[in-house]
């Protein structure tokens, strides 16, 4: 079973074994509007939970994407270079940003599950 967790900064993590797929939530892409550019980290970069991991630019603003977990970037979604709109079309599908090899899987416990994230979004409405 695949587990999805969220941050209050609207990043998501989908865990697949010891690797986490990271991107921004549907709520985040709606707030950004049309995404026009995504700056991805280098493969091999070590990121720390809460540290800057990527940048997403939309017609409205440029926003930092923070690492929801600590780990090493083992893959990036190079499709976003030519098709940044995938973030709008399928943020939790084809619009993923990077894959991290987790250095501290216990950090997952600090993230919100889907139900808790939806409750958090309700407080923003």
From Swiss-Prot:
Residues 19-101 form the Lipoyl-binding domain. Keywords: Lipoyl. PROSITE patterns: BIOTINYL_LIPOYL, LIPOYL. Disulfide bonds: none annotated. The modification N6-lipoyllysine is found at residue 60. Pfam families: GCV_H. CDD domains: GCS_H. Binds 1 lipoyl cofactor covalently. Gene3D superfamilies: 2.40.50.100. GO terms for cellular component: cytoplasm; glycine cleavage complex. Its cofactor is (R)-lipoate. The glycine cleavage system is composed of four proteins: P, T, L and H. The glycine cleavage system catalyzes the degradation of glycine. The H protein shuttles the methylamine group of glycine from the P protein to the T protein. This is Glycine cleavage system H protein.
